[in-house]
């Protein structure tokens, strides 16, 4: 009994309440090496409700439980199972994994339902946001309409206060209507021009992209050194462009300041007069500085006289050298003319052979002239003739080559004919060479004569230009001498100019003081008008309406941003894609597992 009691205390009671004494019943399958243990499954993931599988809590083992008292751990590792209800699950088969997948699919469906509910909520909120946006747009339109009505009412109040008649109001209405029609027409024109410009911009952008692609291809085909140079030049270009942008911004700001100042000046006549006086003063000061610089640059009368005399001497030397060159050329021309006359006289004296030679030379000269005139035609004719002769020569050579094979069978008569043909060929070749040499000689003579003629024409043009320039210089020098000889008159005129400038300076200073006082008065009036305008109720109402309008625009912009962010947050498409992808992967794993189990 003691032993039995001890064994019953050592073994835990099974689910049926019956203790195991001795060996386990035949219904329990003993542990063996063929049992598959789910090592990949996490603790507590066994399908609930399966036979003999304990429900895992997923926690840590408590210190009170001992290994001897409990053969099954809470992490799912199976030991010796006891129970009267039959064998517990020892093998993780297909039904187990299907149960797990069903539980996961149910969890995924619940999550998808939750997401769909959230999407519906976001859609409802978006519809509310859209209604708010539409309401904001309608409110903005109403504000604009109310502003227009307010302006109309203010205009009517002004008209009533000024006691204007109905005819004037109708005239103003007609004028405004005509102006609006003109502006609508101009807007239509601007719209069409804008469309045309946009088309041009698109075409230009396409061309730019094509050019960029072409440049990229060129850069790729370049060598490494050229690519490095290109990159360096590109960086420098970018730096220069940045500097250009900054300078352009500075220039734009300066232009804006200039335009604002010009607008301020345009409204006040006093400022315009002040600007004109400042410009006049600047011109007078620059003229004064110029006169002072001239006075400083001008030395003593003796030095100026020496400079002028030196310049006159240099010019006289140049004139003398040019006159010498002119006389030399004239003498050469006269010599050539005399030689020609002597030749003419000699030719007239000598008759007979000399006269005939002279006539032949004249004819040759005429022939040369005609040849120069008809050079191109003769050249073409000679080239054609040359080509024809070459063709004839080729034909004769072919004929000769054909007849060479028959030399042995040909009699003495054929030898004579062959000699005749050779003589003809030699004669024709010599004629061709003579014609080529004559053509070359004629072309060289023509080129030489043309160069000589061009040189003579250049010399004549240079001589005429130098003559004109020297004559103009002489005239200017004579006028300068006449002016600078009268030194006391120059001094008196300079002193008179200085006195006039001093008087004008005094007058301008008095004007400046007066304008300063006027400016102070105008500023006081401006400040008074400003205070009156700030105290006016209509002005305050308009400012308040403008502030409200700005506030509504800011709210509208904030609502638009809020709508955009919420629409991005409610985008469930990536989550949906991820879920569908995971389901597909799980299905694939199930199919693979089924195939593997069926194969085993």
UniProtKB/Swiss-Prot annotation:
Function: Component of the intraflagellar transport (IFT) complex B: together with IFT81, forms a tubulin-binding module that specifically mediates transport of tubulin within the cilium. Binds beta-tubulin via its basic region. Required for ciliogenesis. Essential for flagellogenesis during spermatogenesis.
Subunit structure: Component of the IFT complex B, at least composed of IFT20, IFT22, IFT25, IFT27, IFT46, IFT52, TRAF3IP1/IFT54, IFT57, IFT74, IFT80, IFT81, and IFT88. Interacts with IFT81; the interaction is direct. Within the IFT complex B, IFT74 and IFT81 mediate the transport of tubulin within the cilium. Interacts (via basic region) with beta-tubulin (via acidic region); interaction is direct. Interacts with ARL13B and IFT88. Interacts (via the IFT74/IFT81 heterodimer) with RABL2B. Interacts with IFT57 and IFT70B.
Positions where Phosphothreonine occurs in the chain: 73
GO molecular function, a single term: beta-tubulin binding
Keywords: Bardet-Biedl syndrome, Cell projection, Ciliopathy, Cilium, Cilium biogenesis/degradation, Coiled coil, Cytoplasmic vesicle, Developmental protein, Disease variant, Flagellum, Joubert syndrome, Methylation, Obesity, Phosphoprotein
Protein name from the UniProt record: Intraflagellar transport protein 74 homolog
Disease: Bardet-Biedl syndrome 22: A form of Bardet-Biedl syndrome, a syndrome characterized by usually severe pigmentary retinopathy, early-onset obesity, polydactyly, hypogenitalism, renal malformation and intellectual disability. Secondary features include diabetes mellitus, hypertension and congenital heart disease. Bardet-Biedl syndrome inheritance is autosomal recessive, but three mutated alleles (two at one locus, and a third at a second locus) may be required for clinical manifestation of some forms of the disease. Joubert syndrome 40: A form of Joubert syndrome, a disorder presenting with cerebellar ataxia, oculomotor apraxia, hypotonia, neonatal breathing abnormalities and psychomotor delay. Neuroradiologically, it is characterized by cerebellar vermian hypoplasia/aplasia, thickened and reoriented superior cerebellar peduncles, and an abnormally large interpeduncular fossa, giving the appearance of a molar tooth on transaxial slices (molar tooth sign). Additional variable features include retinal dystrophy, renal disease, liver fibrosis, and polydactyly. JBTS40 inheritance is autosomal recessive.
Keyword Lipid biosynthesis listed: no
GO cellular component, one term: cilium
Expression tissues: Highly expressed in adult and fetal kidney and expressed at lower level in adult heart, placenta, lung, liver and pancreas, and in fetal heart, lung and liver. Little to no expression was detected in adult brain and skeletal muscle or in fetal brain, thymus and spleen. Detected in sperm (at protein level).
Coiled coil: 98-482
Region (Important for interaction with IFT27): 561-600
Source species taxonomy: Eukaryota, Metazoa, Chordata, Craniata, Vertebrata
Residue positions where Omega-N-methylarginine is found in the record: 51
Localisation: Cell projection, Cilium; Cytoplasmic vesicle; Cell projection, Cilium, Flagellum; Cytoplasmic vesicle, Secretory vesicle, Acrosome
Region (Basic region): 1-90
Chain residue ranges for the region called Disordered: 1-33
GO BP of this protein: cilium assembly; determination of left/right symmetry; heart development; intraciliary anterograde transport; intraciliary transport involved in cilium assembly; keratinocyte development; keratinocyte proliferation; negative regulation of keratinocyte proliferation
Entry similarity comment: Belongs to the IFT74 family.
Highest rank taxon of the organism: Eukaryota
């Amino acid at each position: 009994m003691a032993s039995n009691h001890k064994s019953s205390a050592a073994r835990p009671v099974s689910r049926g309440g019956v203790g195991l004494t001795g060996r386990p019943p035949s219904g329990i399958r003993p542990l063996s090496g063929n049992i598959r243990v789910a090592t990949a499954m996490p603790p507590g993931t066994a399908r609930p409700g399966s036979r003999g599988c304990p429900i895992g809590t997923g926690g840590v083992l408590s210190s009170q439980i001992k290994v001897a008292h409990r053969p099954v751990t809470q992490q799912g590792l199976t030991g010796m199972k006891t129970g009267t209800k039959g064998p517990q699950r020892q093998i993780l088969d297909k039904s187990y994994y299907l149960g797990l997948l069903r539980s996961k699919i149910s969890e995924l469906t619940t999550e998808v339902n939750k997401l769909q509910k959230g999407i519906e909520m976001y859609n409802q909120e978006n519809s509310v946001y859209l209604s708010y946006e539409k309401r904001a747009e309608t409110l903005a339109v109403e504000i604009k309409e109310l502003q227009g009505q307010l302006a109309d009412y203010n205009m009517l109040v002004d008209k009533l206060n000024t006691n204007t008649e109905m005819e004037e109001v109708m005239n103003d209405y007609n004028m405004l209507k005509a102006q609006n029609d003109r502006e609508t027409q101009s807007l239509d024109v601007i719209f069409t021009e804008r469309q045309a410009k946009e088309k041009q911009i698109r075409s230009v952008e396409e061309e730019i992209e094509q050019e960029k692609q072409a440049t990229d291809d060129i850069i790729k085909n370049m060598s490494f050194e050229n690519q490095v140079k290109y990159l360096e030049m590109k960086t420098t270009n970018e730096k220069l462009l940045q500097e250009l942008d900054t300078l352009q911004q500075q220039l734009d700001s300066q232009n804006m300041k200039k335009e604002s100042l010009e607008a301020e000046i345009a409204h006040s006549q006093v400022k315009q007069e002040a600007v004109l006086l400042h410009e006049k003063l600047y011109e007078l000061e620059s003229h004064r500085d110029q006169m002072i610089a001239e006075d400083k640059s001008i030395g003593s009368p003796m030095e100026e006289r020496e400079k002028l005399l030196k310049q006159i001497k240099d010019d006289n030397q140049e004139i003398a050298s040019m006159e010498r060159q002119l006389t030399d050329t004239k003498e050469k021309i006269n010599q050539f003319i005399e030689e020609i006359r002597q030749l003419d006289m000699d030719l007239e004296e000598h008759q007979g052979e000399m006269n005939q030679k002279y006539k032949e030379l004249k004819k040759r000269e005429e022939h040369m002239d005609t040849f120069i005139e008809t050079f191109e035609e003769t050249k073409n004719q000679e080239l054609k003739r040359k080509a024809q002769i070459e063709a004839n020569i080729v034909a004769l050579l072919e004929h000769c080559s054909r007849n060479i094979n028959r030399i042995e069978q040909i009699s003495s008569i054929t030898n004579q004919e062959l000699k005749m043909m050779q003589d003809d060929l030699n004669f024709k070749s010599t004629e061709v060479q003579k014609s080529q040499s004559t053509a070359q000689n004629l072309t060289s003579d023509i080129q030489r004569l043309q160069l000589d003629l061009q040189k003579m024409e250049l010399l004549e043009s240079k001589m005429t230009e130098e003559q004109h320039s020297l004559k103009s210089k002489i005239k200017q020098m004579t006028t300068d001498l006449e002016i600078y000889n009268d030194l006391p008159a120059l001094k008196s005129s300079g002193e008179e100019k200085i006195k006039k400038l001093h008087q004008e300076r005094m007058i301008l200073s008095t004007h400046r003081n007066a304008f300063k006082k006027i400016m102070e008065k105008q500023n006081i009036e401006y400040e008074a008008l400003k205070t009156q305008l700030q105290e006016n109720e209509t002005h305050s109402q308009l400012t308040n309406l403008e502030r409200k309008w700005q506030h509504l625009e800011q709210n509208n912009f904030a609502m638009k941003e809020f709508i955009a962010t919420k629409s991005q947050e409610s985008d469930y498409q990536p989550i949906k894609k991820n879920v569908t992808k995971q389901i597909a992967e799980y299905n694939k794993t199930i199919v693979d597992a089924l195939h593997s189990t069926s194969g085993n």
